Amino acid sequence: MPKLGMQSIRRRQLIDATLEAINEVGMHDATIAQIARRAGVSTGIISHYFRDKNGLLEATMRDITSQLRDAVLNRLHALPQGSAELRLQAIVGGNFDETQVSSAAMKAWLAFWASSMHQPMLYRLQQVSSRRLLSNLVSEFHRELPRQQAQEAGYGLAALIDGLWLRAALSGKPLDKPLAHSLTRHFITQHLPTD
């Protein structure tokens, strides 16, 4: 009989082991056996909880996207009466949170994006994440701009966030957070009306 609470502990162990494996050897070379060994479990446990490697990748990406959502929401909840500018900067901060810019997370995101082009479930997950970012940005810009301008500014800021993140991920170096925040802050202030 399984111990109570063991499922969530095992799932966490396996997701963490998946991130470690992707970080060290890449998604394609990370095997179920390697991931199980890192987690200290049998390969059968992975099959039991996730079916296969694709199920494990999906669960890992759901975990990372959940961390992204939490990072953004925690910052926004701290600014219930904040200006559009402050709330936009909070959204940027959530996207550049350590949970999203660690080496393991960046490599997992890259593997996820590549796999999402071929796997419908991962594609849907990627679309939800992308739409959420754009919707949050447009909503905040729309507090001070007409709808069309807010959509354009939101799209531009989303592209800047993704571009800065992607350049850092592909460089193999940590994201330069001060530079990323400076560039995004400049973009935000350029697009919001001045008092």
UniProtKB/Swiss-Prot annotation:
Metabolic or biological pathway, per its Swiss-Prot or TrEMBL entry: Amine and polyamine biosynthesis; betaine biosynthesis via choline pathway [regulation]
SUPFAM superfamilies: Homeodomain-like (SSF46689), Tetracyclin repressor-like, C-terminal domain (SSF48498)
Signal sequence, start to end: none
GO function terms (MF aspect): DNA-binding transcription factor activity; transcription cis-regulatory region binding
PROSITE patterns in the record: HTH_TETR_1, HTH_TETR_2
A Pfam family: TetR_N
UniProt entry keywords in alphabetical sequence: DNA-binding, Repressor, Transcription, Transcription regulation
Domain of life: Bacteria
InterPro entries attached to this UniProt entry: BetI_C, DNA-bd_HTH_TetR-type_CS, Homeodomain-like_sf, HTH-type_TetR-like_transc_reg, HTH_TetR, Tet_transcr_reg_TetR-rel_C_sf, Tscrpt_rep_BetI
BP GO annotations: glycine betaine biosynthetic process from choline; negative regulation of DNA-templated transcription
Keyword Transcription regulation attached: yes
Residue stretches making up the HTH tetR-type domain: 8-68
Location of the DNA-binding region in this protein: 31-50
NCBIfam families, per the entry: betaine_BetI, PRK00767.1
Function comment: Repressor involved in the biosynthesis of the osmoprotectant glycine betaine. It represses transcription of the choline transporter BetT and the genes of BetAB involved in the synthesis of glycine betaine.
Protein name: HTH-type transcriptional regulator BetI
Species of the source: Escherichia coli O7:K1 (strain IAI39 / ExPEC)
